Amino acid sequence: MNKQASQPRAIYYVVALQIWEYFSFYGMRALLILYLTNQLKYDDNHAYELFSAYCSLVYVTPILGGYLADKVLGNRMAVMLGAFLMAIGHLVLGASEIAPTFLYLSLAIIVCGYGLFKSNISCLLGELYQPEDPRRDGGFSLLYAAGNIGSIVAPIACGYVQEEYSWAMGFALAAIGMLAGLVIFLCGNRHFTHTTGVNKAVLCARSYLLPNWGWLLILLVAAPLLITVLFWKEWSVYALIVATAISLVVLAKIYRQAQTAKQRKELGLIVTLTLFSMLFWAFAQQGGSSISLYIDRFVNRDILGYSVPTAMFQSVNAFAVMLCGVVLAWLVKESVSGNRTVRIWGKFALGLGLMSAGFCILTLSARWSAAYGHSSMPLMVLGLAVMGFAELFIDPVAMSQITRIDIPGVTGVLTGIYMLLSGAIANYLAGVIADQTSQSAFDASGAVNYAINAYVDVFEQITWGALACVGVVLLIWLYQSFKFKSRALAVES
């Protein structure tokens, strides 16, 4: 084996932890909306609000998690602490089947754990390489592929266990997965001795009457309690408003920092891409909420007498991303060798167009359900797969553009703003959209009178909304192409 080309041993422990983190997170996420409506008997409106609040806040806490890792904990300790908190959160969530009061606390613990983990796992991987190490890109590709494996397997495994045993066992499996990843990671501790550890000097220094380790303990207790209150009082939207306002102030500061017209143009492009990405993900995140309940209520899931658990359908999207990503990488390689390139706006138009096509298929499925009572499973799988393929033309394109910006020291900040808007705000908007399908008519026996027309209307509106975005993006693409050709002709003349 060529030692120059082989990856450092530590990466395999990071990859194992990433697989199990994705397994834990996406296994629980596949069950959550179904658990709220089918087990805890929340009405759709309440379930959508809580689900979107949870999915929004997991994109806000990594900002604080990254800060704590940089200043005090170091990436390795932050990742381990985050993994432990997520495992505890999933176990407490399982207990909420018996004691529903634990629900908000469990979600808050998971959000805090995710904040410590998500922002620092990539940074930990980066510490394994020198800045110019040619193996770096391969290591990050391996980490991304590993995550997809976890997100494919998780809904299948957790969905099966929940269906065959109980909701608590389904959530417990997610917790066991996270603990398994943590144990594997700890077994490779000797390979991480060169990475940044806990900053003991800062940790032991005193600030405002207490040593910093005391403030850290207070934060670890207070943060879950504060987020619990946000869930309980439905105040998470205020946290998003504050975070967004701060981001806009920071964005304005970056704009003033730009010294050339080229830099301002690049920043304007990133902002525009971020806004379209936010809309894209507001549509795409229906997969965990309104689409999941639609599948549960109106799709025929029987195969040879076996009823496929609804949660398993969450694997379709992840599988499509992984499979189509390999195909797309080959096609792009071929197009580059033939001197053919795809413009940024062309890719965004294609991604939004595929999202529109996916929801068009779901609209057909919903109309089929309206006519015949239930829709076919293959049609549903096709729609989800097309939506998964669409993702490949959005985030990678936007993130690539962010890393190219020529303003020193702003890449990390812009990435955080992008994740806030396309993650947190998009998930909040997704909840607003999903709420249009809410089913609130309970009869005396407690059964719900599900109205298929609500799903038909929402899926159709998203189809046209995504198509309208395609139209706007194509206009931008045509304008940019015209400007480029005009400039080229002017140079030739």
Curated annotation (Swiss-Prot):
It is found in: Cell inner membrane. GO terms for cellular component: plasma membrane. SUPFAM superfamilies: MFS general substrate transporter. InterPro entries: AA/pep_transptr_DtpD, Dipep/tripep_permease, MFS_dom, MFS_trans_sf, MFS_Transporters, POT_fam, PTR2_symporter_CS. PROSITE patterns: MFS, PTR2_1, PTR2_2. It is a multi-pass membrane protein. It comes from the Bacteria. Disulfide bonds: none annotated. It holds the Pfam family PTR2. The chain crosses the membrane at residues 14-34, 49-69, 91-111, 138-158, 167-187, 212-232, 235-255, 267-287, 312-332, 344-364, 379-399, 413-433, 458-478. CDD domains: MFS_DtpA_like (cd17346). Keywords: Cell inner membrane, Cell membrane, Membrane, Peptide transport, Protein transport, Transmembrane, Transmembrane helix, Transport. GO terms for biological process: protein transport. One of its GO terms (molecular function) is dipeptide transmembrane transporter activity. Belongs to the major facilitator superfamily. Proton-dependent oligopeptide transporter (POT/PTR) (TC 2.A.17) family. DtpD subfamily. HAMAP family: PTR2_DtpD_subfam. Probable proton-dependent permease that transports dipeptides. This is Dipeptide permease D.
